[in-house]
């Protein structure tokens, strides 16, 4: 019996990738909503640790496949755009160090205040101050992230996060 070789059109690959994405998103990402103050703080610490890794792939896994972001004046949709955005961000923001702080929460939302420090290509240090509003799906993935951020130039001796 001769073996048959099947050649699938590119559209098949699209469907396989989407099915794989849907299967991955079905995994739970604890802690899950509804949040308590304790579980909201756990979620915040997990986010801080991931962002301080400066690994765009690792960070992106905390978000839904179709996550919606506003970061300053940029609108970002989906994990692929998140990875591209973070790769670009951390290429410019050297020696990045972040600290997040619990502000408030409801059942599936968390509000965070944060500060981070970084150096630009010229060696100038900055401290960024901001607030984030997060909304999670039932599986514990962040579906929406809205961040307002302001930067202040600082001297190296003024750094908090050494």
Model segments located where?
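A beta-strand edge to alpha-helix "cap/lid" segment located at domain peripheries
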Residues: 25-35, 84-162
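Residue-identity detector for glycine
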Residues: 2-3
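Residues at secondary-structure transition points
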Residues: 8-9, 53, 84, 136
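Intrinsically disordered, low-complexity regulatory regions of eukaryotic regulatory proteins
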Residues: 14-15, 46, 130
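Short, low-complexity N-terminal intrinsically disordered segments enriched in polar/charged residues
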Residues: 20-65
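Short, Lys/Arg-enriched N-terminal segments with co-localized hydrophobic residues
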Residues: 6-25
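A solvent-exposed, acidic/Ser-Thr-rich amphipathic alpha-helical stretch
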Residues: 39-42, 56-109
């Amino acid at each position: 019996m001769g073996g048959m070789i099947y050649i699938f059109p590119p559209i098949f690959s699209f469907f396989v990738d989407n099915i794989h994405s849907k299967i991955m998103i079905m995994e739970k990402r604890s802690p899950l909503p509804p949040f308590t103050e304790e579980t909201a703080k756990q979620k915040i610490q997990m986010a801080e640790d991931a962002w301080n890794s400066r690994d765009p792939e690792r960070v992106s896994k905390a978000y839904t496949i179709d996550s919606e972001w506003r970061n300053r004046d940029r609108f970002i949709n989906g994990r692929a755009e998140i990875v591209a955005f973070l790769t670009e961000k951390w290429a410019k923001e050297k020696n990045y160090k972040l600290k997040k702080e619990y502000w408030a929460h409801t059942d599936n939302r968390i509000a965070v205040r944060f500060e981070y420090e970084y150096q630009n290509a010229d060696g100038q240090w900055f401290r960024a101050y901001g607030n984030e509003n997060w909304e999670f799906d039932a599986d514990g993935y962040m579906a929406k992230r809205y961040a307002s951020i302001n930067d202040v130039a600082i001297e190296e001796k003024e750094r908090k996060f050494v």
